[in-house]
Amino acid sequence: SLDKAVELKSYVAPFTSLVAVLMPNSIEEVLEVYNALKPNAIQLHGFESLEFVKKLRDLKNNGKIDAHIIKVIHIPKDEEIDFKTLLNTAKDYEKYADAILVDT
């Protein structure tokens, strides 16, 4: 829960970067977590659309959030990897994310 995350934040060393790992349903949910925790980075770990990440980038560019945006791209475990598609997806998201994380 968000209340538990706020509590846990008090145990984080001051020199440590705080990353909020989210699978948000809305931009409002991201803002709620950001405003409560003020993380150094927001990791989008779900299947957020390119448009969703663009909206988050716009909020960052407009000074509404001050956190790095990390977008996770999932690789299915039981399927053959199409590296060309994976690379193209990463290139699309890199326009709006500060970092891309590939996860299986």
Model-identified regions with their sequence ranges:
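Conserved anion-binding
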Residues: 4, 11-19, 25-104
